[in-house]
Design a protein with these regions (language model features):
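A C-terminal cap/extension of S-adenosyl-L-methionine-dependent methyltransferases
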Residues: 126, 219, 228-269
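A short acidic, Gly/Pro-enriched loop at the edge of an enzyme's catalytic core
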Residues: 132-145
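Acceptor-substrate binding/catalytic loop of class I
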Residues: 197-216
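Conserved class I S-adenosyl-L-methionine
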Residues: 58-70, 173-199
């Protein structure tokens, strides 16, 4: 039986005004912002650990963060670690104004002559529009692409994968952290129990959860990249078994180890 508290909260979230959502995100109430917003140092370390484990480096590299959230902290940290340039793409970002006090540690990264301070275009490019706009500028391709808990919110992942591939230089590396859980964390697999029509009409939040599984991401990225690998970061087999009989067949492979996965790192190159 479907949990009543889940259904009530999902419907409320579905129809919650965007202004209220933004307010709750800013204050960290009920709806949690992404790690780049609430813990940027941890986000930077997560990216760096993945890059270093792959034998790669940010030194002299042009890096794209797909869905940066609005804060520049991770971009600044990457530049501090030796990156040549950072491109930030997010059509839904809530930009955090950069004051002189915040800009000062960045040294020559900002032009602090006005308020808010503005990143120097030779070091940071900010695109508050879909990735296609960056591609339309015919700017330099990037060497590394990073994202954290972004792809599960994308409506057209196939299109996003194609555009990300187009933005990447030959030999470029992708590191995408993907959260496969229902974002109502008490019920990590509950969203998989509903038909597409019911989910889209009544339960899908304004931030969109596409409900794609590991095999979907593997298929979509393999269509545009020569190499794709998925590292499991977490799984919840007990929670999966509790709702296994209710999960719709299109979300199942029959392999519990794969079906119970909740968080992954997808690499593509």
């Amino acid at each position: 039986m479907a949990p009543i508290d889940y259904l009530v909260l999902r419907v409320v979230r579905r129809y919650m005004p965007e202004r209220l959502v933004r307010l709750l995100l800013r204050r960290g109430l009920i709806i949690r912002p992404g790690i780049e917003t609430r813990a940027p140092a941890a986000a930077f370390r997560r990216f760096m650990d993945a890059i270093e484990r792959a034998g790669e480096t940010v030194l002299g590299r042009r890096i794209l963060i797909f869905g940066y959230g609005g804060r520049l902290d991770v971009a600044l940290a990457l530049l501090g670690a030796g990156a040549r340039h950072v491109v930030l793409v997010d059509p839904y970002a809530a930009p955090v104004p950069i004051t002189r006090s915040i800009a000062a540690p960045g040294g020559t990264i900002f032009d602090p002559s006005g308020l808010p301070a503005v990143p120097l275009p030779g070091l940071i490019t900010v695109i508050h529009a879909p990735l296609g706009q960056y591609l339309s500028k015919r700017d330099d391709p990037v060497d590394i692409v990073l994202s954290n808990s972004v792809l599960e919110h994308v409506g057209d992942v196939a299109g996003a994968a194609r555009e990300l591939a187009q933005a990447t230089a030959p030999g470029g590396q992708h590191f995408h952290f993907i959260d496969l859980r229902d974002h109502f964390s008490r019920y990590p697999f509950e969203m998989l129990c509903y038909s597409e029509g019911t989910w889209r009409r009544f339960l899908n939040p304004g931030s969109n959860l596409n409900r794609l599984r590991v095999f979907d991401y593997e298929r979509l990225f393999s269509a545009v990249f020569q190499h794709v690998s998925v590292q499991v970061r977490d799984s919840q087999p007990a929670a999966f078994r509790a709702v296994r009989s209710r999960i719709r067949p299109e979300f199942l492979t029959g392999d519990e180890q794969r079906d119970a996965v909740t968080q992954v790192l997808l690499r593509a190159w």
